[in-house]
C-alpha cells in the first residue's frame, strides 16, 4: 500500500514540476478556492460574521499590514477584480498555507469568537510571512505576479 502511495506521489510531483507557470497557477488557484471555502466554514463555526474583516486579518499578517484592497491597488487591479486570480503559483501556495494552517488552528484551539478568529488568522499570516523570509525568499510586499 505505502509503496503504491509513494509512487503516486512521485508521479504527481513529476507531473507538477513539468507544468507551465500558468498551469501551476491554475492548479494552485483551484486548491486555494477549495481551501477558502473550508476556512469559511471553520470561521463561521468560530463565530465569524464579518468575513471581510476576517480575511483581511489574514492578508494583513501575510502582507505586512496590507488589506485585500491595498494589495489590489498595489497590483493595479480594477474594482472587484479578485486578487487571488492575479497571483502566481508561489504566492498562491503561500496563501494556501496560510488558509490551511488558520483553519487547523481555529478547529484545534476551538476558537469561539470573531475577535479570536481574526487574531488567529493575523498571527498565522505573520508566521507564514516569517517562514518565507527565513527560507530566503524576498517576500516583503514585492511578490507581485501580475
Task: Annotate each predicted stretch with a short phrase.
Residues 1-146:
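Positively charged, phosphate-engaging catalytic surfaces used for nucleic-acid and nucleotide handling
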Amino acid at each position: 500500500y505505502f509503496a503504491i502511495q509513494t509512487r503516486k506521489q512521485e508521479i504527481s510531483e513529476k507531473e507538477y514540476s513539468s507544468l507551465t507557470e500558468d498551469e501551476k497557477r491554475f492548479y494552485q488557484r483551484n486548491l486555494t478556492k477549495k481551501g477558502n471555502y473550508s476556512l469559511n466554514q471553520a470561521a463561521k463555526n468560530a463565530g465569524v460574521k464579518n468575513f471581510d474583516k476576517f480575511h483581511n486579518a489574514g492578508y494583513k499578517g501575510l502582507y505586512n499590514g496590507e488589506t485585500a484592497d491595498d494589495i489590489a491597488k498595489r497590483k493595479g487591479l480594477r474594482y472587484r477584480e479578485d486578487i487571488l486570480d492575479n497571483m502566481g503559483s508561489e504566492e498562491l501556495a503561500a496563501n494556501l498555507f496560510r488558509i490551511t494552517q488558520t483553519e487547523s488552528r481555529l478547529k484545534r484551539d476551538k476558537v469561539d469568537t470573531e475577535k479570536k478568529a481574526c487574531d488567529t488568522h493575523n498571527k498565522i499570516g505573520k508566521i507564514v510571512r516569517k517562514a518565507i523570509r527565513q527560507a530566503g525568499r524576498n517576500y516583503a510586499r514585492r511578490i507581485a505576479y501580475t
